[in-house]
Amino acid sequence: MGQELSQHERYVEQLKQALKTRGVKVKYADLLKFFDFVKDTCPWFPQEGTIDIKRWRRVGDCFQDYYNTFGPEKVPVTAFSYWNLIKELIDKKEVNPQVMAAVAQTEEILKSNSQTDLTKTSQNPDLDLISLDSDDEGAKSSSLQDKGLSSTKKPKRFPVLLTAQTSKDPEDPNPSEVDWDGLEDEAAKYHNPDWPPFLTRPPPYNKATPSAPTVMAVVNPKEELKEKIAQLEEQIKLEELHQALISKLQKLKTGNETVTHPDTAGGLSRTPHWPGQHIPKGKCCASREKEEQIPKDIFPVTETVDGQGQAWRHHNGFDFAVIKELKTAASQYGATAPYTLAIVESVADNWLTPTDWNTLVRAVLSGGDHLLWKSEFFENCRDTAKRNQQAGNGWDFDMLTGSGNYSSTDAQMQYDPGLFAQIQAAATKAWRKLPVKGDPGASLTGVKQGPDEPFADFVHRLITTAGRIFGSAEAGVDYVKQLAYENANPACQAAIRPYRKKTDLTGYIRLCSDIGPSYQQGLAMAAAFSGQTVKDFLNNKNKEKGGCCFKCGKKGHFAKNCHEHAHNNAEPKVPGLCPRCKRGKHWANECKSKTDNQGNPIPPHQGNRVEGPAPGPETSLWGSQLCSSQQKQPISKLTRATPGSAGLDLCSTSHTVLTPEMGPQALSTGIYGPLPPNTFGLILGRSSITMKGLQVYPGVIDNDYTGEIKIMAKAVNNIVTVSQGNRIAQLILLPLIETDNKVQQPYRGQGSFGSSDIYWVQPITCQKPSLTLWLDDKMFTGLIDTGADVTIIKLEDWPPNWPITDTLTNLRGIGQSNNPKQSSKYLTWRDKENNSGLIKPFVIPNLPVNLWGRDLLSQMKIMMCSPNDIVTAQMLAQGYSPGKGLGKKENGILHPIPNQGQSNKKGFGNFLTAAIDILAPQQCAEPITWKSDEPVWVDQWPLTNDKLAAAQQLVQEQLEAGHITESSSPWNTPIFVIKKKSGKWRLLQDLRAVNATMVLMGALQPGLPSPVAIPQGYLKIIIDLKDCFFSIPLHPSDQKRFAFSLPSTNFKEPMQRFQWKVLPQGMANSPTLCQKYVATAIHKVRHAWKQMYIIHYMDDILIAGKDGQQVLQCFDQLKQELTAAGLHIAPEKVQLQDPYTYLGFELNGPKITNQKAVIRKDKLQTLNDFQKLLGDINWLRPYLKLTTGDLKPLFDTLKGDSDPNSHRSLSKEALASLEKVETAIAEQFVTHINYSLPLIFLIFNTALTPTGLFWQDNPIMWIHLPASPKKVLLPYYDAIADLIILGRDHSKKYFGIEPSTIIQPYSKSQIDWLMQNTEMWPIACASFVGILDNHYPPNKLIQFCKLHTFVFPQIISKTPLNNALLVFTDGSSTGMAAYTLTDTTIKFQTNLNSAQLVELQALIAVLSAFPNQPLNIYTDSAYLAHSIPLLETVAQIKHISETAKLFLQCQQLIYNRSIPFYIGHVRAHSGLPGPIAQGNQRADLATKIVASNINTNLESAQNAHTLHHLNAQTLRLMFNIPREQARQIVKQCPICVTYLPVPHLGVNPRGLFPNMIWQMDVTHYSEFGNLKYIHVSIDTFSGFLLATLQTGETTKHVITHLLHCFSIIGLPKQIKTDNGPGYTSKNFQEFCSTLQIKHITGIPYNPQGQGIVERAHLSLKTTIEKIKKGEWYPRKGTPRNILNHALFILNFLNLDDQNKSAADRFWHNNPKKQFAMVKWKDPLDNTWHGPDPVLIWGRGSVCVYSQTYDAARWLPERLVRQVSNNNQSRE
């Protein structure tokens, strides 16, 4: 290594000198780093042995490829600079001898440093290798091959060894015609270990080697296929070869053919290949360095062949670099990005087992994508397995997925190569099916091109979406091409349209390659300048170009070039009769007459007169242009159909397509006026064309009209095509009768088409337009007022027995009425022609006349017409037919309303002297009832920048939509935004505070409507209302309460405030208001169409009826009513035909099924998951054939821990139940009810609980009892009675009828017994008039319900038995059970603490001890005496902790008995004489005696702690148990363990005797409500605690507390408090002085002086917290009870180390206490005093009682000296 390094350094040094001679100075270290980079990038360079311009350029090419692949961050900054310098050094022919010497020396170094011996060849004559290994390694390999074995090392994976293709014999060592420079360049790339996997075959290393060079490469089967096709291209045609290869490849994938591989050299490893890949024999090379390092593109399964030709397969691990690269690509670009798919395809070119694929996918993809891939992979494997089964090759689903017997890796390694190919195909296909990152998964038709989106990007999105839907984009290429045009933007459509059928998808892309944002902008500007829309501009742009001749009308030339009207051939035109004066033959513009031939004045010439003809032939978007050869034809050219035809046929001159949306269109006929003299024309449509759906409007053609006669026509319902030359109308010529009417114009000429003399008008006269109508059969006469929004009836005409209500609406006109009255119900109006409708008029007093408003006139189809030309044209354009009414069926009122006035009616008078303007009441939701009018203000929460931006955008959208308005309301609640899965934001408002102030409305629909109640055979229409909440306005008085604020960051600006105008989401009453509003809107429809079955639930409406035409008419009226109410129907959600989707069901003909449901078992992990799943299943049960017994294992999973996140898992039984659910969902269906047939209710004896079914030849609805019984022990016959009650209730609820027949499993005699001995059966059958039977209909579907074996009581007798053993049982809450018989008593201990359950254990012991003997059992438990007899007939026992288990055990003992027994009840402790009372007393006494014996001190301590939560020291002293046992009792308590121990008592000044010094304070405990103020006083000598609950902490509350304390322990000498106002007041000072109590306060804001009472607060609150969670009465007690219990514990139960409680210390004070004697120094005068007794030794301080001054003093410990060890007793 040292020699090599020195050579390398010498090489770099010489190169540096050579550069220096050219004036280039470089650092040695930088140059050394540069050549290290050269070596890493071009590992072949040191082996070349020479350096020249050709090899150096190859180095530059490697640099460039490395830069393009890995980016600039991987390439040193100076790399290309140094390369250029050295290139100039080598390329330029130097004359400087120093430079040439340096170059020569450099070449020598390269030659001597070459590490490869390329002269040796392999010993195998069939396959020569260029070995880079040492001689020793080769010898070892040779020896191993002689023995017929491969290397003993673990087989390594080698790339495929390929030879160069030559035209010579394979044994020729000198190939010719090879581009060695290019081959070496590619080989150098391959040897770079950092290079990504190459898919092409690189050429050999060096042309100088004598043997045929071969290199390592991963062969791509597609490239190999292309090479084969290229070799055979000259022999056969390309298409035949392509088809043959495709057929062969398909056979390989299905396993019909196997792949054979040629033998290779012994010990040589070969990589698996795609089926059909051929590995040519030849000379290969293998590098030992490469053998020691597994290449990154070799994958798990490899195959080696030993010297004997035996193939061995090996499994290797994945290279981490490949997984990392694939993981990075999937994360950054997406799992289906082209780059990611390229890596996946390169991986798929190798042999990967199913386990390897699963490992790779799980490592690369996310959890969700992994599951998606796995499901798609399994689906692909199923399809492949089916094809394999047909082919008979034995490759089944288990082999393809690596499951079952093929789950081990060893088994998968032995797969056939063709099977590997099928696995790779299934895996890659599944990978391509993964969803695109960030794509919500829209449908293919929903992919549309954006306005500025490049067309190529749009096509790419289409192809990607098609690939996911069809499996591959090629499968839907025609569909993609169609959508690429239809969903393109207008600009691209215009570019494609001329070539749409002439090119393919790539041609589309080329045509639209230049269309971008700038093109769109220019297009919009061009359309704007031309006065057209962009669409019209593009359509006209592509039409035939060229001018139109204004003379002949033909295209292709202009008027100046017209040959038909050349000036030299033109005949002079002679004027006819002047149309102005009609008195001479001259031109009208030359007429100078002032009057016509009738003497009427002629208006002078001024301005533009009648509009002339269009400048050119008419073009239409929907029709073809007028044929250029069409000439203007006169009336005389028209033909008649037959000699007797009255009309002349009119034909269309263009091919036209009409749709209903286009409305009336004018069709050209090519016929021009004028008509023959003294005639006028009437245009009528032909009956044959009317039958085709084309409506021709009648028209009048004037005699003096000279323009083109056109036909007004429209398509009524469907698209109609009018071909050129079709006869569609007739022109009838009628005689013209001239009258003396005034003429407006001298002549019509070529004016606008149509008559100018006919208008649809109602003359205005002096009479009032009155109208007589009948409201609920009472006649009313009123004035037609088109300016009034509503109808108004005067109070004087209103019947007094008709109800009216007050409104919140103000009616305004010339007069004004505030809060007028309105009819409480809708009235039915009727006119003389029996037209009718509903109306809800207002009632106003003192009104001169009744007013019919627009709410009524609109229902009557009354029209207002105008004689104005513009208005007439507008009405014609909108579809108005002369003589016909408006509407789709034109069935409105045809004639004007009679205008006869009534003379006996007075005028308006002073009330209405002008036009009236009465505003209609605004339709809105009902007002909300509020608990309080006090404003509610909740501050707005701060929002992050992204959420604030989203909120601002959403608020702006709502503002533009009119859903909110600006506000200054005193109400405010916060808003927030959440991000949906689709990436869009949603605006929400926290209305909890507002909801708390409103009176909640009840639910209007407590349940979902069922589609089975729709009559059978009815046709249906289902609609969904769009944005229903946002379409319903809030009542104006309620809007201010739903205000919110939009904040700003850093308070940069005042908050913008808004309030909702529509129903807000999150408001508690919004659903109810929505239902009421929609119900009101469709009320008229329900009233008018009573024969229809209409279901309304929230925003879903279903209409069903017998007659389809009536259903459509009802739907039409429903649309009108909803539109009038401001509600909008979502067009995309209108369902008109099967299958319908409604409320989670699919309605297809007579069958009703649930929508396809998929149960995700992998998501079932917690109690919450199972709860939601079973809730959904329970919702589906009325439509499934599932019994409660079928679902019981699933219901059992809900038992256990109540934590929603507690773990749950599926048992085998639960999994089987879930499979039954899936099967039932897939197969279930129910049918609609037929109300003409009897309704039968069937009851089946299914397991656990009975199951009900409504039946009419097919199942209608399944009925189930609740999963949990209402009783712990519910007999089966009582369950059937409950099911009868439930079935009858459901029948009336959903169908409105009682079942005609109830079929149940009991016979008539059994029913009689049930009626006499049970309570439920008489109730269930009460008032039932139908048939009660037990014969089921003969139907196979009914037989699926297995009969349940039911029994009547047989073993348990209702009366005592004769000659039976007498047994008494009893149980105690201590867990002791006992039973006695004759003179024997048996007792045993249980682990139960309930007396009822313990006695049940005793009863089980009796039944177990005497299974074959009759028994008379007596118990003092009434519960057991009633429950045990029910066990014999109970099918399901409700789960209640231990109770269910014991009852099940007892039930099993009863089932196993064959000899009856009796159980009776006896009252305990009755004191009655006799054997029964005495026997019960013996059993009871046995439990009590035993209980007293086992009540040890430890159990007593445990019970005491459970009751009072005493501390460990008190338990130890009170019950004489060890200290550790006492501590364990406290530690095991779940309540006490959460509280810290009470701190040390401290060293505050204390009294020397009881009632000397008290400390007093107030603490708060909020859970006590108004009594949260706890006044606490403590005697500092004994620690005796007193506390009272008060409603405040003022002086009066303090005095009340002290008076209570004085009544218990008397008056103190001194009280110390803080400086609170209750303690420093004058009244409290007077109170203390009156009772001679010294009151002192501590230092302000220093609670340490009150340390004793402060610690007492903590002790008191801790004790309250403990006992309120216990099992004693304080759990449900009052605050005073809880406080008193806590004081009892602290004062009387807690003991100190002297075994005394606080009460003992207070009431039994021992004055003969021994004290230590000390001398002490007074710090004021430095004098010593004493000896005096020590009261308290503190931490650094001592409390000494001065006998001289009779007072205690606190002194520092350094001023105290103990004088003796003798103690003094202080009296």
From Swiss-Prot:
Propiece residue ranges = 101-161
Q: Which residues form the G-patch domain?
A: 867-913
Summarize the impact of G885A: 70% loss of infectivity and 60% loss of RT activity
According to UniProt, where does the site described as Cleavage lie? 100-101, 161-162, 216-217, 299-300, 525-526, 759-760, 873-874, 911-912, 1496-1497
Superkingdom of this protein's organism: Viruses
| UniProt domain Integrase catalytic: residue ranges | 1550-1719
Organism the protein comes from: Mason-Pfizer monkey virus (MPMV)
Q: Does the keyword Repeat apply?
A: yes
Higher taxonomy: Viruses, Riboviria, Pararnavirae, Artverviricota, Revtraviricetes
Q: What is this protein called?
A: Gag-Pro-Pol polyprotein
Positions annotated to bind Mg(2+) 2: D1370, E1399, D1420, D1484
Q: Which cofactor does it need?
A: Mg(2+)
Keyword DNA-binding tagged = yes
One Pfam family, please name it. Answer: RVT_thumb
Q: Where is this motif: PTAP/PSAP motif?
A: 210-213, 335-338
**Annotated phenotype, changing G879A:** 85% loss of infectivity and 65% loss of RT activity
- Cofactor stoichiometry and binding? The RT polymerase active site binds 2 magnesium ions.
